């Protein structure tokens, strides 16, 4: 994809700004991230099964589940890398809100209703009621993964203000701002876990209107780091941080009963200290390694998969329930091979379904 140029005479028609070149590294990151999200929700069934805790198959599930713990922050960073672009606000905040929030509106309304009254009630057999649904909406967790809709809407609402502050400050201002916000977020979480462990319950929780707050730092970091390209020993060093950090999260979770102090000082959370560092590291590694990569003939496939990623995030839980209705694929809480197979099937079906739905007028607004 190359920037478009104006071919008309300069004297009679003003030159149009060049269309932004597609950032294939972000496309790849988006695809990997949503595959990781599916893994977290598929393998989490076995990770939470006390009957297999500590077994080899349980550790296998932990490696996959916790090995992808960085993908949700990276999803937010990808959004920041694209949404905080100044051209998004060329026509003012009102135009931005109209385009972005109206685009999310149908999905924002449809999917909570679908998951509560179809997936939970019909597919999972848990009878839902309007009171429980409304409480879930206020809490921002009408279904397991749908907090992300509130998260994204909150960041979109704040985006024009953040972009205005960043506009004339260059990458340095963006990096400092992102670092400060992330540091405050991490410190808030750690102080809460320390105080709670000391007997003063300060557990953190977010409602629908605050789901986005802990992720502002990642949103800013995506913009600050989107053009960061490391080479040589710097790239090797950051890659080592990403790998070692991911491994440490896996080990810490698997041995948490024996390492209680680590859980207090380094809580495993999407905005915990180690996970935050790991997410930043993987983002920079991907941007650096894939900076000049071109998919060639695979460009169409990469584009379709990337554009379908948000829809996959929305539909995959329904697909998980559907796949598990097959008796041979039901035991994802104690059979690692079946769990891997279910993961692959859910990814393939979800991407295919969303790619098809995106071609249907009106329905495409939901995915």
Residue spans of the language-model regions?
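Membrane-cytosol interface segments of multi-pass membrane proteins
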Residues: 1-185, 330-367
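Functional transmembrane helices that form membrane-embedded active or gating regions
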Residues: 22-34, 102-105, 233-246, 289-321, ...
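Aromatic-anchored segments of alpha-helical transmembrane domains
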Residues: 35-42, 113, 180-194, 241-256, ...
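Specific transmembrane alpha-helix
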Residues: 72-84, 150-163, 190-231, 272-293, ...
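Membrane-interfacial entry segments at the cytosolic side of transmembrane helices
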Residues: 169-178, 230-240
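Juxtamembrane "helix-exit" motif on the non-cytosolic side of transmembrane helices
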Residues: 190-199, 250-262, 324-330
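Alpha-helical transmembrane segments and terminal signal-anchor/GPI-anchor hydrophobic tails
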Residues: 231-299
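C-terminal transmembrane-bundle signature of multipass membrane proteins
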Residues: 278-288, 314-324, 347-359
